[in-house]
A protein has these predicted regions:
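S-adenosyl-L-methionine
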Residues: 138-184
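Conserved SAM-binding motif I beta-strand of class I
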Residues: 131-136
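Conserved SAM-binding loop of SAM-dependent methyltransferases across substrates and taxa
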Residues: 118-130
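Conserved alpha-helix/loop element of class I SAM-dependent methyltransferases that forms part
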Residues: 85-106
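C-terminal catalytic and target-recognition region of SAM-dependent MTase-like enzymes
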Residues: 217-273
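S-adenosylmethionine
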Residues: 166-242
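Conserved class I S-adenosyl-L-methionine
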Residues: 106-117
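Non-catalytic substrate-recognition/targeting regions of SAM-dependent transferases
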Residues: 2-19, 23-85, 92
Length: 273
């Protein structure tokens, strides 16, 4: 991914490049010394520290290319810029999974993309020919995803954009008897407000409902998480338990230019062959 690069990590921080912009932001897992010297870290275009952008907050949005998509980046809350680089490697797999499912089914697969954020996974599926339902509880995030669809030339693809709590949406789909061929979800550790999402207590019931709307067995499932204790092995076990399909899992890891490796969570997927 030429426009996405982890330059270095250490001291609880990560130095990344998104296109032409270098970003310095926290990485709690990077509890080691940086691999590069201070000069490499000296002049980032954006820097997040002490819960705010301390450098570059007024920067205009810019675009990058990743996975055949054009995506808009900009300074956002929580030190985010709109793209999770560690997910980019999964988009190619999603494209193949959609194509394989379409060939097997004889029609475009119906894909549900939950916690869809700014749309990377959603657009990877749509680009490959899927009919996609994109769900996120954040109205600004969904608007951002729609903007990315426009930038990527996918605005006219069959994508439904839903601003709603993922749990509520899936429960309603289950009551209605709707079915999906592919499931993609990247749940956060926790949400905010009354009845907010907590992955420790809410993921298993959500997977149970998802299994019911993708039965008897989905064409493919991709589950990822950034929560401590939810590594690839555990996520793979969850997919096997709830969907009854073979699943493999591994850690979400970025390798830095400096040679260091930064763990960022886990993923599990199956059964696309």
């Amino acid at each position: 991914m030429a426009d996405l690069e982890l330059i270095d990590c250490g001291g609880g921080r990560r130095l990344e490049r998104f296109g032409a912009v270098v970003v310095d932001r926290p990485a709690p897992a990077a509890d080691w010394l940086p691999g590069l010297g201070p000069s490499a870290w000296a002049k980032p275009g954006l820097e997040w520290a002490r819960s705010t952008w301390v450098r570059g907050a007024a920067r205009d949005p810019w675009t990058i290319r990743a996975g055949g998509l054009t995506l808009e980046c900009r300074p956002a809350a929580g030190g985010q810029v709109g793209v999770f680089p560690e997910h980019a490697a999964t988009w190619e797999w999603l494209g193949r999974a959609v194509a394989g499912s379409a060939e097997r089914l004889g029609r475009p697969p119906e894909v549900l993309s939950l916690f869809g954020y700014t749309g990377g996974a959603t657009l990877a599926c749509a680009k490959a020919g899927a009919r996609v339902v994109h769900v996120d509880s954040s109205k600004p995030a969904v608007a951002w995803a729609r903007r990315n669809a426009e930038l990527s030339g996918l605005a006219e693809r069959p994508i439904r954009w839903i601003v709603e709590d993922a749990r509520a949406f899936v429960r309603r789909e289950r009551r209605r008897g709707n079915r999906y061929d592919g499931i993609v979800l990247d749940p956060p550790s926790y949400g905010h407000g009354t009845g907010a999402w907590h992955i420790e207590t809410d993921l298993a019931p959500l997977l149970e409902d998802l299994a019911a709307i993708s039965g008897p067995k989905p064409s493919f499932v991709l589950l990822s998480a950034h929560t401590k204790g939810f590594g690839g092995e555990y996520l793979g076990a969850l997919v096997r338990e709830h969907f009854g399909i073979a699943a493999t899992g591994d850690d979400l890891v970025l390798r830095a230019r400096s040679g260091l490796r930064l763990p960022l969570g886990g993923w599990a997927r199956g059964p696309y062959h």
